[in-house]
From Swiss-Prot:
Keyword Cytoplasm: yes
Signal sequence segment: none
CDD domains reported in the protein's UniProt record: TrmY-like
UniProt cross-references to InterPro entries, sorted A to Z: Alpha/beta_knot_MTases, TrmY, tRNA_m1G_MTases_N
Subunit-structure text: Homodimer.
PANTHER family for the chain: TRNA (PSEUDOURIDINE(54)-N(1))-METHYLTRANSFERASE
Known function: Specifically catalyzes the N1-methylation of pseudouridine at position 54 (Psi54) in tRNAs.
Protein name: tRNA (pseudouridine(54)-N(1))-methyltransferase
HAMAP family: tRNA_methyltr_TrmY
Enzyme Commission number(s): 2.1.1.257
Organism: Methanococcoides burtonii (strain DSM 6242 / NBRC 107633 / OCM 468 / ACE-M)
Alphabetical UniProt keywords: Cytoplasm, Methyltransferase, S-adenosyl-L-methionine, Transferase, tRNA processing
UniProt catalytic activity: pseudouridine(54) in tRNA + S-adenosyl-L-methionine = N(1)-methylpseudouridine(54) in tRNA + S-adenosyl-L-homocysteine + H(+)
Amino acid sequence: MRNFVIIAHKALTTGDFSLNDLPGSAGRMDILCRCINSCLFLSHDLRRDVQVHLLLLGEPEPGKIIRFDSEHVRYLNPDERSAGSLIKKALQKTAGEYEVRSTPGVFIRSGNLGTLLNEFKDAGRRLIYLHEDGEDIRELSDLTNNAVFILGDHMGVTEEEEQLIKEHEAKTISLGPIPLHADHCIILINNEIDRNLSGKSQ
């Protein structure tokens, strides 16, 4: 199962926000909503082999992880408000060390980037960090669903986060020389994996 980690530095960590103001009072929650849709949606269906891990680092309780499991998620439509509603419901739950289900296929717990990286590393997953200075993704012939892709939000990734990612031996890859929005990167990544798995990669 392919995994995406999106680091959200300003995203509000309580459910006290309006679905009518996702970019503002919710701390650019609109970015996370677009990332969820890019990760999970096909033309007329949902992907069933994707997990999305939203790392929320905004106020007032930084350090929450919301996981979307595409195999079991329900009540998700292809619009920002729908995804925002599921995030809001998750944030209304008490987040502790262990996951709590808020709605089908959506879970929340407390944690940080190190928490996720350690878990993936211990599970033998391949960590891939997206950055325009990395190796061209099309040079990777073994891109499969085993990979975990790590992306920043509109603020990118801090030096401390990047150092932690490198300490966990993540491979840095690029989708091209020009920085792209995280949700656009996800669509391109999914396409590359789809092509590799179908044997049509060039």
